[in-house]
């Protein structure tokens, strides 16, 4: 099978991971990214992606391949404007080639207009909200609010993040697990601020990490309550003070912290699904997370692979105290979760799942 992968120039964890997985499953020469995305090649290497030799296919070359039916599947990797515009440039040559759309955006909205624009036969959604049930075609039936276009019914499938082979590399030296629990992330949701504040003020727990802000982030990002947000807004929502800004960790230090942690916390950001959710398990660290509100096929199980805490985190200190000294229980869960990750949640497995659905449904 040969796939044309229509790209957007911006970083997009879902589409970038799926490209990585497709190259592993189909081999690089059978996955053509158009326009060629520097992040996938040597111009702007990304630490979480396996780099591939540059193959800057010109527009006329790609159009010829489509017209000559040498392309078996077109994947529009994002509903963002760059990918949509690239598809429009190719649309006249599409010639009946099956098309699918990936949507890795933070919200739960189904972008029916984008699906219609590209003529998507299947729609893959990262933030695929519960409740759901399996329909008679074997597909996931989303809430009624999703059905803005009846042509998509039974053709929308969950596609959460995963972990790439490049991001599973372990630190070269053995590190001591001297941190009870850690969390590092942008202050993109007030729940992150609440969780960090709770862990910092809990006595007897060794916590490391925090939330960071970009230079343009405002003071309201640090508010842990609606009252705090409203107060910041009434003040004109000034920039966050310098003392409150944690520097963003580089990749090496972040991975080292995961490997020093007995447990690591995943908290929703713009969407529930975070890359951290999968990276923690890849580091063989016990994942503690709020229960997901999205569909994750073959998700980890509470008490067997991971620990799901309350949405308000009130039980989090007790969880940390109970498990930090129980090395055997933690190790059993960590090893079970790691095996489950390799079986179901690598970028290669995600790509295989996507391709199998395309072969069956298109």
Question: Whereabouts are the PLM-identified features?
Answer:
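Nucleotide-sugar donor-binding catalytic core of glycosyltransferases
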Residues: 2-277, 282, 286-302, 361
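A structural signal for short, well-ordered beta-strand elements
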Residues: 247, 308-309, 343
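Conserved acidic donor-binding segment of nucleotide-sugar-dependent glycosyltransferases
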Residues: 306-312, 322-325
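A charged, aromatic-enriched C-terminal amphipathic alpha-helix characteristic of glycosyltransferases
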Residues: 325-358
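Charged catalytic carboxylate motif
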Residues: 315
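Short amphipathic alpha-helices within nucleic acid-binding modules
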Residues: 319
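Generic anion/oxyanion-binding catalytic loop in active/binding sites
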Residues: 243, 269, 305, 326, ...
């Amino acid at each position: 099978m040969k796939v044309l992968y229509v790209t957007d120039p911006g970083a997009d964890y879902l589409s970038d991971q799926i490209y990585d997985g497709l190259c592993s499953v189909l081999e690089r020469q059978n996955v053509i990214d158009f326009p060629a995305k520097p992040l996938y090649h040597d111009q702007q290497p990304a630490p979480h992606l396996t780099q591939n030799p540059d193959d800057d296919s010109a527009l006329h070359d790609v159009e010829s391949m489509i017209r000559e039916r040498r392309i078996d599947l077109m994947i529009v990797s994002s509903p963002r404007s760059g990918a949509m515009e690239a598809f429009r440039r190719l649309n006249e040559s599409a010639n009946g080639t099956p098309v699918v759309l990936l949507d890795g955006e933070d919200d739960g909205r189904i972008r029916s207009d984008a699906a219609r624009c590209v003529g998507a036969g299947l729609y893959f959604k990262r933030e695929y909200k519960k409740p759901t049930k399996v329909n008679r075609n074997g597909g996931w039936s989303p809430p009624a609010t999703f059905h803005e276009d009846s042509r998509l019914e039974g053709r929308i499938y969950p596609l959460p993040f995963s972990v790439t082979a490049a991001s599973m590399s372990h630190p070269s030296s053995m590190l001591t697990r001297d941190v009870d629990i850690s969390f590092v992330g942008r202050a993109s949701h007030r729940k992150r601020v609440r969780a960090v504040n709770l862990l910092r003020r809990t006595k007897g727990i060794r916590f490391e990490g925090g939330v960071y802000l970009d230079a343009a982030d405002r003071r309201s990002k640090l508010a842990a309550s609606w009252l705090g947000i409203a107060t910041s807004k009434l003040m004109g929502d000034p920039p966050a003070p310098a003392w409150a800004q944690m520097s963003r960790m580089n990749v090496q230090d972040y991975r080292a912290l995961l490997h020093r942690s007995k447990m690591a916390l995943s908290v929703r950001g713009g969407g529930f699904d975070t890359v951290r959710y999968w990276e923690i398990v890849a580091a063989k660290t016990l994942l503690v997370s709020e229960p997901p509100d999205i569909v994750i096929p073959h998700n980890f199980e509470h008490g067997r692979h991971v620990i799901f805490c309350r949405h308000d985190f009130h039980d989090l200190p007790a969880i940390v105290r109970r498990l930090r000294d129980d090395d055997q229980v933690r190790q059993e869960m960590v090893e079970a979760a790691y095996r489950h990750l390799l079986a179901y949640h690598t970028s290669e497995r995600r790509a295989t799942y996507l391709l199998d659905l395309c072969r069956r449904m298109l």
